[in-house]
Amino acid sequence: MAAPLALVLVVAVTVRAALFRSSLAEFISERVEVVSPLSSWKRVVEGLALLDLGVSPYSGAVFHETPLIIYLFHFLIDYAELVFMITDALTAIALYFAIQDFNKVVFKKQKLLLELDQYAPDVAELIRTPMEMRYIPLKVALFYLLNPYTILSCVAKSTCAINNTLIAFFILTTIKGSVFLSAIFLALATYQSLYPITLFAPGLLYLLQRQYIPVKVKSKAFWIFSWEYAMMYTGSLVVIVCLSFFLLSSWDFIPAVYGFILSVPDLTPNIGLFWYFFAEMFEHFSLFFVCVFQINVFFYTVPLAIKLKEHPIFFMFIQIAIISIFKSYPTVGDVALYMAFFPVWSHLYRFLRNIFVLTCIIIVCSLLFPVLWHLWIYAGSANSNFFYAITLTFNVGQILLISDYFYAFLRREYYLTHGLYLTAKDGTEAMLVLK
C-alpha cells in the first residue's frame, strides 16, 4: 500500500504547487470560506512584521494565532508554501496509519464477537471482510488530500491546516495506545484552537478500552487511569502555555487568542453561524447569546460519551464534525477533516436515508458561496441575508448529514444483535425508529 499512498501524495503536492504558482492563489487567500480572522495568513504576516519591529504581535486587534505559530513562521516564512504542503501530507499519513490500525482492532473485535455468538444469525451480510476494509486507509488519505476544501485551505495558507495535523496525530497516537503522546497532541490541538478539548472524552474512552479497563463509576482502575491521563493532558497544556509566556514575556496571547475565540468580537462573515446573529443583535444581549452559541460545541459531549462509550472512534468523528459546525470561526478546512472519515463508515451507506440530497445541498452551497458574496459585496444586488441564508443551509446540511450517519451507525449496531429482519408481536415486519 506504500506505492498507492506515495502516488496520492505526489498528485496532491503537484496540484498544490501548481495552484501556488497560479493567479488563483491570491484570490483563494481572500475567500471568507477558506480563511477566518483566526487562520488568515495575512494576519500572520502582520503579526510577524510587528514581532520584527520589537512590538508584541498582540498589541493590535489583528493577530490572533498562538505564539508557537508565529515563532514557527518567524524562521520558516520563506518556506511557508512548503510548510503547508508538508502539513497536509503529514495529516494524510497520520490518518492513513491511524485507520489502518483501527481496522485491525475492528476486525479482531468482530471475530471475537462472532466466536462468542454475540451476533444474530441472519446478519452475515453486515459482517465486514478484510478485502472490504483493505483500501479504506488509502481512501481516507485520498479523501483528505484531494478534497477541494483541503486544497483551497492549503493554497490560502490557512493555519487551520496545522490544527488538522495536530488532531490527526492525536487520533494516531490514541489508536496506537500511546497515552503520553496522545495527551501531548491533544494539549497542542487545544492550545491551538481550544475546541479540541472536547476530544478528551473519546480519547480517554478509547485508551480505557485498549487497556481493558471497564468504564464503570465504581471501578478503581477507571478512576486511576482517567486521573493519570487528565494529569498528562493538563500538565502538557500548562507546559505549552508557559513556554508561550517565556517566548513573549507576556500573557497578552491568552485574551488575544482564547478570549477572541470565546467572545467572538470580529464579525467578519464566514461559513459559521455566529457572525450574522451578533451583527444584528443589541449589544446588551450579546453575552447571553455568546454563551448559548458556544455551549453547542460542549453540550453534546456528555450524552454522546454515554451513548457511544463502546465506540469511541465514531464518537471522535461525530465530535470533530460538531466542532467544525459550531465553532466561532469555522472554515472549509475544518469541514475537510471530518469528511476524510467518510470511507471509514462506508459500511453504513446502506442505512443512510438522505445521503444523495444532503450531498447535493453541500455541493450546491459550496458553489453558491462565492456567487452570493459577489452579489452582496461587489454587485450590490444582494445583502447579507442572502449570504447568511446559504451559510445556514450549508450548516443545516452538515447537521443532517452527521445525524444521518449517527442514525445509520446505531441502526446497524441494533441489527447486529437483534437480527436484520425484525418482526412485530403480530408477526408483521417491524420498522426501526430512532427516538
From Swiss-Prot:
<dbReference type="GO" id="GO:0046425">
    <property type="term" value="P:regulation of receptor signaling pathway via JAK-STAT"/>
</dbReference>
<protein>
    <recommendedName>
        <fullName>GPI-anchor transamidase component PIGU</fullName>
    </recommendedName>
</protein>
<feature type="topological domain" description="Cytoplasmic">
    <location>
        <begin position="307"/>
        <end position="311"/>
    </location>
</feature>
<feature type="transmembrane region" description="Helical">
    <location>
        <begin position="312"/>
        <end position="331"/>
    </location>
</feature>
<feature type="binding site">
    <location>
        <position position="383"/>
    </location>
    <ligand>
        <name>a 2-acyl-6-[6-phosphoethanolamine-alpha-D-mannosyl-(1-&gt;2)-6-phosphoethanolamine-alpha-D-mannosyl-(1-&gt;6)-2-phosphoethanolamine-alpha-D-mannosyl-(1-&gt;4)-alpha-D-glucosaminyl]-1-(1-radyl,2-acyl-sn-glycero-3-phospho)-1D-myo-inositol</name>
    </ligand>
</feature>
<feature type="transmembrane region" description="Helical">
    <location>
        <begin position="385"/>
        <end position="406"/>
    </location>
</feature>
<dbReference type="GO" id="GO:0005886">
    <property type="term" value="C:plasma membrane"/>
</dbReference>
<feature type="topological domain" description="Cytoplasmic">
    <location>
        <begin position="407"/>
        <end position="435"/>
    </location>
</feature>
<comment type="subunit">
    <text>Heteropentamer. Part of the GPI-anchor transamidase complex, consisting of PIGK, PIGT, PIGS, PIGU and GAA1.</text>
</comment>
<comment type="function">
    <text>Component of the glycosylphosphatidylinositol-anchor (GPI-anchor) transamidase (GPI-T) complex that catalyzes the formation of the linkage between a proprotein and a GPI-anchor and participates in GPI anchored protein biosynthesis. Binds the lipid portion of GPI-anchor. May act as an organizer in the transmembrane layer to recruit other subunits, and thus is essential for assembly of the complex.</text>
</comment>
<comment type="pathway">
    <text>Glycolipid biosynthesis; glycosylphosphatidylinositol-anchor biosynthesis.</text>
</comment>
<feature type="topological domain" description="Cytoplasmic">
    <location>
        <begin position="100"/>
        <end position="136"/>
    </location>
</feature>
<keyword id="KW-0256">Endoplasmic reticulum</keyword>
<keyword id="KW-0472">Membrane</keyword>
<feature type="binding site">
    <location>
        <position position="309"/>
    </location>
    <ligand>
        <name>a cardiolipin</name>
    </ligand>
</feature>
<dbReference type="GO" id="GO:0006506">
    <property type="term" value="P:GPI anchor biosynthetic process"/>
</dbReference>
<feature type="transmembrane region" description="Helical">
    <location>
        <begin position="332"/>
        <end position="345"/>
    </location>
</feature>
<keyword id="KW-0812">Transmembrane</keyword>
<dbReference type="GO" id="GO:0016255">
    <property type="term" value="P:attachment of GPI anchor to protein"/>
</dbReference>
<feature type="transmembrane region" description="Helical">
    <location>
        <begin position="179"/>
        <end position="194"/>
    </location>
</feature>
<dbReference type="GO" id="GO:0034235">
    <property type="term" value="F:GPI anchor binding"/>
</dbReference>
<feature type="transmembrane region" description="Helical">
    <location>
        <begin position="223"/>
        <end position="244"/>
    </location>
</feature>
<feature type="transmembrane region" description="Helical">
    <location>
        <begin position="195"/>
        <end position="205"/>
    </location>
</feature>
<dbReference type="GO" id="GO:0042765">
    <property type="term" value="C:GPI-anchor transamidase complex"/>
</dbReference>
<feature type="transmembrane region" description="Helical">
    <location>
        <begin position="137"/>
        <end position="158"/>
    </location>
</feature>
<feature type="transmembrane region" description="Helical">
    <location>
        <begin position="79"/>
        <end position="99"/>
    </location>
</feature>
<feature type="topological domain" description="Cytoplasmic">
    <location>
        <begin position="346"/>
        <end position="354"/>
    </location>
</feature>
<dbReference type="InterPro" id="IPR009600">
    <property type="entry name" value="PIG-U"/>
</dbReference>
<feature type="topological domain" description="Cytoplasmic">
    <location>
        <begin position="206"/>
        <end position="222"/>
    </location>
</feature>
<feature type="topological domain" description="Lumenal">
    <location>
        <begin position="373"/>
        <end position="384"/>
    </location>
</feature>
<feature type="binding site">
    <location>
        <position position="385"/>
    </location>
    <ligand>
        <name>a 2-acyl-6-[6-phosphoethanolamine-alpha-D-mannosyl-(1-&gt;2)-6-phosphoethanolamine-alpha-D-mannosyl-(1-&gt;6)-2-phosphoethanolamine-alpha-D-mannosyl-(1-&gt;4)-alpha-D-glucosaminyl]-1-(1-radyl,2-acyl-sn-glycero-3-phospho)-1D-myo-inositol</name>
    </ligand>
</feature>
<feature type="topological domain" description="Lumenal">
    <location>
        <begin position="23"/>
        <end position="78"/>
    </location>
</feature>
<feature type="transmembrane region" description="Helical">
    <location>
        <begin position="159"/>
        <end position="178"/>
    </location>
</feature>
<keyword id="KW-1133">Transmembrane helix</keyword>
<keyword id="KW-0337">GPI-anchor biosynthesis</keyword>
<feature type="transmembrane region" description="Helical">
    <location>
        <begin position="287"/>
        <end position="306"/>
    </location>
</feature>
<dbReference type="Pfam" id="PF06728">
    <property type="entry name" value="PIG-U"/>
</dbReference>
<feature type="transmembrane region" description="Helical">
    <location>
        <begin position="355"/>
        <end position="372"/>
    </location>
</feature>
<feature type="binding site">
    <location>
        <position position="216"/>
    </location>
    <ligand>
        <name>a cardiolipin</name>
    </ligand>
</feature>
<dbReference type="GO" id="GO:0003923">
    <property type="term" value="F:GPI-anchor transamidase activity"/>
</dbReference>
<comment type="similarity">
    <text>Belongs to the PIGU family.</text>
</comment>
<feature type="topological domain" description="Lumenal">
    <location>
        <begin position="245"/>
        <end position="286"/>
    </location>
</feature>
